[in-house]
């Protein structure tokens, strides 16, 4: 009888131990809502399977600066062929921005303005790629603070021009340089 009581006591202790050590699922894996303040800007996109930089089980996405960095600035480097700035996909804006800066010594250009931005201690801002810029357009009502202007992307067009997007119509222009100046809104990846 004494052995039975001891056995039941061990089962009880073991069960309580398992219960207290069980891992509680937390809400930390919830996808944050588009439009919230996040890492110095406003969250506008959470990476999905197939996106460059997507890692299953991890939260990664894109944040936009809360206001324009410039309202009248050139894409820059007129007459200079920019190599490596022709990527359009989500996840390629930073690479395009670096390629533009490496090929162009002008200081007052869209890519440079974005790369030099520091907001709330975050200094990894860049000019969005064509597809990243389109995501901004699609979410502009949630993000707010966007005007119906032409915005630059970091995606080059034909080596000499840059892609831009009209935030009134949503139309994307490959020969955006003919318009001269565009607005700039920096983004960052997390």
Model-derived segments and their meaning:
Residues 1-3:
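N-terminal secretory signal peptides that target proteins for export/translocation
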Residues 6-15:
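Sec-dependent N-terminal signal peptides
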Residues 7, 24, 93, 138-139, ...:
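Alpha-helix initiation/capping motif
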Residues 30-31, 48-49, 107-109, 116, ...:
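C-terminal, surface-exposed recognition/capping segments
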Residues 73-77, 127, 146:
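Non-catalytic, surface-exposed connector residues within folded enzymatic/regulatory domains
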């Amino acid at each position: 009888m004494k052995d039975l009581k001891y056995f039941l006591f061990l089962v009880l202790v073991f069960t309580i131990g398992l219960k207290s050590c069980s891992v509680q699922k937390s809400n930390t894996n919830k996808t944050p809502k588009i439009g919230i303040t996040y890492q110095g800007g406003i969250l506008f996109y959470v990476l999905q399977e197939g996106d460059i930089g997507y890692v299953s089980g991890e939260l990664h996405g894109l944040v936009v600066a809360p206001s324009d960095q410039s309202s009248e600035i050139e894409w820059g480097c007129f007459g200079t062929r920019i190599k490596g700035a022709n990527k359009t996909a989500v996840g390629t804006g930073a690479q395009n921005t670096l390629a533009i800066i490496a090929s162009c010594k002008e200081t007052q250009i869209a890519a440079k303005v974005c790369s030099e931005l520091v907001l709330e201690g975050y200094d990894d801002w860049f000019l969005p790629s064509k597809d990243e810029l389109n995501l901004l357009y699609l979410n502009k009502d949630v993000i707010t603070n966007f005007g119906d202007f032409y915005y630059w992307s970091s995606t080059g067009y034909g080596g000499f021009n840059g892609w831009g997007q009209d935030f009134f119509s949503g139309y994307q222009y490959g020969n955006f340089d003919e318009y001269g100046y565009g607005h700039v809104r920096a983004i960052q990846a997390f």
